[in-house]
């Protein structure tokens, strides 16, 4: 279990914007709180923060739809991700999702 953080706190920690598609997130979205972090789309639960990681044979960004279908509170997205991002998904846009994950771990 992760200490509770809201998306706005996370964005401050990572010095990164919170977005919905290409527009800034509204105040309600910024206040969304997540208590768990998951890098595995198969283990996601409602209210989690999804951090899609890239590997040699996969890219977690390919599972953003699965994350939305279980009701995640938001996701980190790599700035260079050119694929589909569900419109309703609140995202924190970072240069590298693995590095951001490490920053979160150090802060908590």
Tell me what each language-model feature is.
Residues 2-108:
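Short, basic phosphate-binding NTP loop
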């Amino acid at each position: 279990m992760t200490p509770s953080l809201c998306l706005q706190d996370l964005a401050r920690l990572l010095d990164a914007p919170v977005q919905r598609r290409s527009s800034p997130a509204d105040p309600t979205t910024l206040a969304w709180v997540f208590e768990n972090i998951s890098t595995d789309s198969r283990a996601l639960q409602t209210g989690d923060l999804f951090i899609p990681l890239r590997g040699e044979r996969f890219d977690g960004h390919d599972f953003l739809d699965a994350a939305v279908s279980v009701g995640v509170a938001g996701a980190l997205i790599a700035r260079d991700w050119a694929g589909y991002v569900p419109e309703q998904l609140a995202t924190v846009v970072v240069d590298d999702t693995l590095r951001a994950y490490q920053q979160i771990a150090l802060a908590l």
